[in-house]
Each structure stands twice: as C-alpha cells, then as structure tokens.
A protein has these predicted regions:
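Loop-helix junctions at membrane interfaces
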Residues: 1-162
Length: 162
C-alpha cells in the first residue's frame, strides 16, 4: 500500500473512531462539550499520519458539530492542537512532544482563541475561564492517554509497522 493510500485510510479510521467514541465520551460544560477523545485521536494521528491529522481534526469536528456532540468551539481547539502536535513530532520524532503539542495547541492557544469567538457570538465572557480550563483539562487527559497508547505500541515494535 502506498503512503498516500495508507494515510488516507488511517485518517478515515481515526475520524470514525473520534466520532463514535466522542458520542459516548463527551463532557457538556455550558456552551462547549469537552472532547478528550478528540485530543487522544489528534496525538495518535500526528504520529501515525503526519499532516493528515489536520484534515482529520477538521472532518471530525465538522461531523461532531453536525451530530450535536460538538460545538463551534471544536474547531479552534482541535485544529490548532493537531497542527502543533504534528509539527513538534515531525521535527523531533519524540512521542512526548506530540502530546505536549496537543496540550499547548488546544489547552493554551486554542483556549486563547475562543475568547474572540465568544465576543463574535455575543456570548457571556464571564464563563471564559471555565471554558479555557475545560480545554486544558480535556487536552491533558486525552493527550496523556494517547501518549500511553503510543508508548505501548512502540514498546511492542508495532509503531514502526503502522
């Protein structure tokens, strides 16, 4: 199987996993739904598919919004987190940096980016800190679990085969 076909196939599988698991594991917090599965899948995708993880994040977020298990706030967190996880892993080839990239991208940069979105949507900005904290906690949890999964795959020699 050539690399393009492999990456497209893995991206489709990760989107499906994200949407299905996100249906069961979603934490409603006011106007957002914390999605630790999105963060888990983002880190896996950054390592397994490279830049395709950004496509996966966009498609997953769109489907989750259409299904009602995500909100418009899914975009800034998931896409920025996926992109930073990919960039840090791509240039370092270190699994911890993929997880750190997701946490910084979603939990910090993504959380900062929702404030202007809240202003545009005329939402109460008094709840911003709660939302930002939810982004951070959700991304730490999801990235942590994915890091553990990737370590186990690497330990068993399976990561190189994927």
């Amino acid at each position: 199987m050539n690399k393009l076909t492999k990456n497209m196939s893995l991206t489709a599988v990760l989107v499906a996993l994200n949407v299905v698991l996100g249906t069961f594991i979603s934490i409603p917090l006011g106007v957002i739904r914390a999605a630790p599965m999105q963060h888990l899948i983002n880190v896996l995708g950054a390592v397994l598919t490279g830049p395709w993880v950004i496509v996966q994040a966009l498609i997953s977020s769109t489907i989750r919004i259409l299904m009602g298990t995500g909100t418009v706030f899914s975009y800034p967190g998931s896409i920025i987190g996926a992109a930073l996880a990919y960039v840090l892993y791509h240039y370092s080839k270190k699994l911890p940096l993929a997880a750190v990239g997701e946490v910084i991208g979603t939990g910090v940069i993504g959380a900062l980016s929702i404030y202007p979105l809240m202003l545009i949507l005329d939402l109460d900005t008094n709840i911003y800190m709660v939302m930002a904290l939810a982004f951070l906690v959700s991304s730490i949890f999801g990235a942590g679990v994915s890091y553990f999964i990737l370590l186990q795959l690497e330990k068993r020699g399976l990561l190189k085969r994927l």
